[in-house]
């Protein structure tokens, strides 16, 4: 299922998260005034390659970086929600898929964090949940 959408922060509409699931992978970008501040890989749209693909616009994350977690690819954008926070002066966008925290983007970190990341890589960092 391919889709793309944007969600603006209500208190400061100059910030926006764009989510796209097109081509080979899904990703999200935190933007301010059309400038990317942070981006993160969300999931591959099919199996992970052994070596990372680096020449495509929407890169698939390589198997070495993808955790072996059960994950159902969303069928529509309605399954994805963005929640906004402030963290030590930075803007934090939390991305939920089916009401489960899936990824975070912080305005002062170029690469975001994703729960499907097994180890830090060029497309996503590990999302550590504090419970």
Feature-to-residue mapping (PLM):
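Surface-exposed loop/turn elements that mediate protein-protein interactions on large endomembrane-trafficking
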Residues: 1-3, 28-75, 102-127
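Structural signature of eukaryotic scaffold interfaces centered on beta-propeller domains
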Residues: 1-13, 18-22, 74-88, 129-131
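Exposed beta-strand and adjacent loop surfaces of beta-rich binding modules
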Residues: 25
